[in-house]
Amino acid sequence: MGSGESKNFGNIAQQSRLDHADLTVLLKQFNAISKNGEIKKDDLKKIIEKKYGSDSSLTAILYNLFDRDGDKTINFTEFALAYGFLVNKTLDDVVDTSFHCMDLNGDGNISKGELRAVVMMNKKMEKYIQNDKKVPLDKLTLLPIEVSKINQEADDLFLQLDVNKDGGVSKQEFIQLASSSPELKKKLTSYLVRDEALDFFGTTK
């Protein structure tokens, strides 16, 4: 990202719904961890693992959230947009982002395995917060009955989403169903990273 872009707070503020003070703090954080104006997946992975422990699902979800254009790097605009999305999100602006985040391998479809991983990560995050963030995600243990219940929840949801029963949920299926059912939209968007987890970059908003 060039210096001209980093100074263009006006456009970024409008898109991210963050103010100048927020962006100034974010730019300092971005510069502290970026190399040549960008953050690569391995860089983000190290930050996430330091905070939460090793959890590939969380890393994939967060990286997909930040890497908006899919070029495998995160520039400051993407960094600010993702943070702004997390702190200012509404039901109407998260459906597309939810699909992008849940499509863990970026192949354009959500598989049953990916949906299970997303729901499992979400439940672990709930437990992480309940434990005052003292136990890393990869150290949290779930009882077999909890795992079974979580997988069943994910499988039931997958059956709803996989309209044409081809074993994958396309973006079209996802958006169509979420847009036609407020209850389903709320459920799907609740699986995104929770606001309480925003401190992995040291943010305090």
From Swiss-Prot:
Classify the source by domain of life. Answer: Eukaryota
User: Where is lipid attached as N-myristoyl glycine?
Assistant: 2
A single GO molecular function, which one?
calcium ion binding
Give binding positions for Ca(2+) 2.
103, 105, 107, 109, 114
Q: Name one GO cellular component term.
A: phagocytic vesicle
In terms of Pfam families, this protein maps to:
EF-hand_7 (PF13499), EF-hand_8 (PF13833)
Q: Could you tell me the keywords of this UniProt record?
A: Calcium, Lipoprotein, Metal-binding, Myristate, Repeat
InterPro entries named among the record's database cross-references: EF-hand-dom_pair, EF_Hand_1_Ca_BS, EF_hand_dom, Recoverin
Looking at the record, the residues that make up the EF-hand domain are 54-89, 90-125, 149-184
Q: Where does Ca(2+) 1 bind?
A: 67, 69, 71, 73, 78
Q: Which family does it belong to?
A: Belongs to the recoverin family.
The misc remark on file is: Probably binds two or three calcium ions.
Q: What's the protein here called?
A: Recoverin family protein DDB_G0272130
Give the organism, scientific name: Dictyostelium discoideum
